[in-house]
Design a protein with these regions (language model features):
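Membrane-helix boundary/helix-loop-helix interface segments in multi-pass membrane proteins
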Residues: 2-4, 28-29, 37-46, 50, ...
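Interfacial segments of multi-pass membrane proteins
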Residues: 176, 180-195, 273-297, 356-368
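Loop-to-helix entry and N-terminal half of a specific, functionally important transmembrane alpha helix
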Residues: 314-353
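Hydrophobic, glycine- and aromatic-enriched re-entrant/interface helices and adjoining loop segments
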Residues: 200-297
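Hydrophobic alpha-helical segments of polytopic membrane proteins
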Residues: 75-76, 153-165, 172-223
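A juxtamembrane structural motif centered on a specific transmembrane helix
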Residues: 1-8, 30, 342-343, 347-394
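Structural signal for the C-terminal ends of transmembrane alpha-helices
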Residues: 57-68, 130-138, 183-192, 307-316, ...
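Hydrophobic alpha-helical transmembrane segments
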Residues: 50-58, 121, 292-312
């Protein structure tokens, strides 16, 4: 009993408080969004309460595991996650592996419901890439361009195969989350700056060329380049770049812009949102918040997210070992991309992707994955405090 009390005292109270605010906001926003009548008698708010209860239990379990043990478990967790993605790929469409909106991303279990392996694989990739960097740095104390290039090669070797499988589901958004996590870990790994510039320069150059072609030669962009994409990707690009011209493809973008704009500064009030957005309790929950809470509440939520990210960075910066620092960096990368992509698509700055707003959107797999990541953060904080305590005693 005393051990449990000591463990709870070691948890980062500020991070827990921020998560509690997001928890309450999520449940309230989901409850309000389901009042529009499109969901029948389904109570997603109650389900989200259950999801959060389970999520906090998962958080505490992971937070109680030492970082050294997590590092040792990196390979087994990765292998289990990779195998689950392979199984999902090879099994035919069925009630166990359903195809929803043209994508086969889930296992559907009795009672438990749908589970998305790619969501949980984020943690496996975070753990293994961070562990790989730590071991590589210990092996090659004298850093050279060749050793840094070898490190990137190792990371690509364990990242590309699962990323390709996830991309084929199709789930492009999840692949970008993997890339964000890996990029942040590589950035903090201590590799030479010229290699970072080289790695960052390639996608920036490609993006710049695409923007130039879009502005100067729109016919080539739409008739030659966009047509190279898959049909669902073409639809999202067209709906993003000109939602009012391509009304079918850009319907969700139109409606979310209408919801955000109609909220004004103070909002319409709780439960008074009347703009219809398909599945607004999931990826478009921020539109509900902006419509009913207005600019004031929307800005408050954005500030809470920045507080969360800054708290994780502080914990990562004060971590007692490189492994903990790299985990924090990777998690910040994942959350930042989710945050900016989701809010960006709500206000029309980014294309619509199946990326949930972390801790606010309804969903079990996404929330559980994020809470497990917070458990990793708290484990880093706990380990650091234990380290400091032992030094003081010595």
């Amino acid at each position: 009993m005393v051990g449990k009390i000591v463990f709870l005292k070691k948890l980062d109270k500020k991070l827990i408080f921020i998560l509690f605010i997001l928890c309450v906001t999520s449940i309230v926003a989901i409850y309000s969004s389901q009042q529009t009548g499109q969901y029948g008698n389904q109570n997603f708010a109650m389900k989200q309460m259950v999801n959060y209860a389970i999520g906090f239990v998962l958080l505490l379990i992971v937070a109680n595991i030492d970082l050294d043990q997590l590092q040792k478990l990196a390979w087994p967790i990765y292998i289990v996650g990779f195998i689950s993605i392979i199984i999902l790929k090879v099994l035919p469409v069925s009630s166990f592996t359903p195809e929803i909106s043209g994508a086969k991303r889930w296992f559907r279990f009795p009672i438990i419901g749908a589970t998305q392996p790619a969501e949980f694989f984020k943690l496996a990739l975070l753990l293994l890439v961070a562990s790989l960097v730590v071991k590589h740095n210990a092996q090659y104390m004298a850093r050279t361009f060749q050793t840094d290039l070898l490190l990137i090669g190792k990371i690509f070797l364990i990242s590309i195969p699962p990323a390709l499988l996830v991309y084929s589901q199709p789930d492009t958004g999840m692949v970008f989350l993997y890339i964000a996590a890996i990029a942040c870990i590589i950035f903090m790994s201590g590799i030479q700056k010229k290699l970072i510039v080289l790695c960052a320069g390639i996608p920036i150059t490609v993006l710049s060329v695409l923007i130039f072609i879009y502005v100067k030669y729109p016919d080539i962009f739409f008739n030659k380049l966009v047509t190279l994409l898959k049909p669902h990707q073409q639809s999202r690009i067209l709906g993003w770049l000109d939602p009012f011209q391509h009304t079918d493809q850009g319907y969700q973008t139109q409606q979310s812009l209408l919801a955000v704009g109609s909220g004004g500064v103070e909002g319409k009030g709780f439960g008074s949102g009347n703009v219809y957005i398909p599945e607004k309790h999931t990826d478009f929950i921020f539109a509900t918040i902006a419509e009913e809470g207005g600019f004031i509440v929307a800005t408050f939520i954005i500030c809470i997210f920045f507080l969360l990210l800054s708290r994780i960075l502080i914990i990562g910066n004060s971590a007692g070992n490189l492994f903990g620092t790299l985990l924090c960096a990777g998690i910040v990368g994942v959350l930042m991309l989710q945050f900016f992509q989701n809010i960006g698509m709500i206000v029309g700055l980014m294309p619509v992707k199946g990326i949930a707003l972390p801790f606010l959107s309804y969903g079990g797999s996404s929330l559980f994955s994020n809470m497990l990541m917070m458990g990793l953060i708290l484990s880093t904080r706990k380990t650091y405090k234990e380290y400091m305590f032992s030094v003081n005693q010595h």
